[in-house]
Amino acid sequence: MDTDTKSSTTGYDAAIGTDHSNTKVSNMEDFVSLLKTRNIASPETVWAVVHLEDRPANIQVLQLEQAADTGLLSVKKIHKADFSADNGLIATYAGSVSPWNTHLGGEEWGVPDSLKWDSNTAGAFTDAKNLGRDILSLRHLGHHDKDLAAIKAAWTPYMHRWVNEVSIDDSSSITTPTITATKHYSMGRYSIELPYCIGDFPQVCYITDDSNTGVAAMFIPDEANDLSAGTLYAMKVTQTSTKSVGGGMFDVEWVSLGHATNAEVQKLMTKSDGSYIQFTDMFEIGTKTGGDYDFTCASGFKATVVSGGAMCLKLKAGMEKAASRLETRIYAAYVGASSQWRKLEGITWSKNRKEMYFAVSSAEDSMEHQLAGDGDHSDGDHIGIEKNKCGCVYRAPLDANNRITSISPLICGVYEHFNSADKLKHTSSKDTCDIHNIANPDNVAFMNGHDILLIGEDTSKHKNNAVWAYHMETHALTRINTVVQGAETTGVWYAENINGWSYIMNQVQHPDPASTYGGAGTVGYLGPIKVPGAAAVGVDSGGKKAIELIAETKAAAAAVSGTVSFVTIVPAVFAAMIALMI
């Protein structure tokens, strides 16, 4: 969520002093992964990789120690993930843990639209002031106080909105691990919610695009556990249910966007004259003729759904690879994929059920049928559901090649159903979605072995955001955690069987300044959850090139026991300071 709030720093003054002129104290903790040590002599070591969803963003690496008898985690040392070789990070949001024990995340927002950045397009920026608060994204590069021409000479939005990966090799030293940080340009550029690579073969990675006109993407790496090269696909859906009724049911096919490597895409960002590539280097923009929903384009141009409407576009010769990676969403729509997903959020996988689950936070606007002027055109109007401000979670079965084949709603929120004044005993406008159901689902995680889907909210339609447990067999919905007013529950993730303990990761982001820690967020978990009768899996012995094997999967089948409570790993001051390089 985009806030950039100026929260109280009272709780931090003792640690960082009262002069905050060169420091931003973040309350934007988001996804936190727990990674297993590669050091056989130190199985109690666990690594936490922490997202901070700021402009600019930061990823910190915490060395944790796990208590063998209780499973409790404590911080021993703090490191950072250095993305300076990839121009730093902006607004790192949700994430996942790869099957090869690395951290995967992405950059979601915080940079201007590339159409506005291109001086050859209508409505292009003419002054640095046009960037608004996105100027904050340039502080770590020292460009935030320059004029527009100077910024354009040194920076482009195409540097951001990529998948990132953090790998930790502590096999030689726990105190000085090798932390490798990289962006994967091969996987395409979007408003990335998160990448998710399923832990089975053939290996497939899914990427969700949190936009008003988003796409769902699938990446197949050339080599397992190596995301530096592969083939990208975009989802095309055919609606099989009645238009404008319910959450919709769809058949799925996959449209190829071609093959690319990280190195190839990086090279394409810069033209032969040393300047950065622009939108009109890849696409020619044509004129629309006729109505808004059923307009026509000149010969050679295609009506293409883009953010804020639809355009007539023509791909320039030889620009397939550049467009497929730098303008993935628009190129996907151009070649016939579906680009009407509205706030396509978290995604997760059930190994036993062989299904993916993903959240659509707000099932409305571009997902509604024939919504003229808001991203629809008759040629690309693939999705037409009933408006639902409270959002839905969808289920998507996989075939033998681990590709999604169909989509149907699993659970949808209900707008203004239960919440009448006589039942709630209050008339809060912040409970406009049924309080006994989900509202604007954001992060999802599957508890393999327990057959439970975890659903975290990012909503203004519940007074307090919640984390829910959806029981797949009974369809029962249980609220397992709520956060204080003004806060979002972020980074919901099930860290499974680390030395016989499991953790439901859950951060508290941007709470009301009157709440705990003077408005600071927290990094923590529900648990520890004891996994009885299971082989402890705490050491990653294979490194980046080996998938975790069968012991951990078997351990997930054990029943949950023991006391579960919310534990703060570390006060936010340790995990939430960004020293601005200005």
Please give the residue ranges for each predicted region:
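Conserved small-residue
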Residues: M1-I547
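Generic alpha-helix initiation/capping and coil-helix boundary signal
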Residues: G88, E552, T568-A572
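Compositionally biased amphipathic helical and low-complexity segments enriched in hydrophobic
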Residues: K116, I550, M581-I582
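C-terminal low-complexity, Ser/Thr- and acidic/Pro-rich disordered "stalk" regions positioned immediately N-terminal
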Residues: K544-A558
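Cleavable C-terminal sorting propeptides in eukaryotic secreted/cell-surface proteins
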Residues: A558-I582
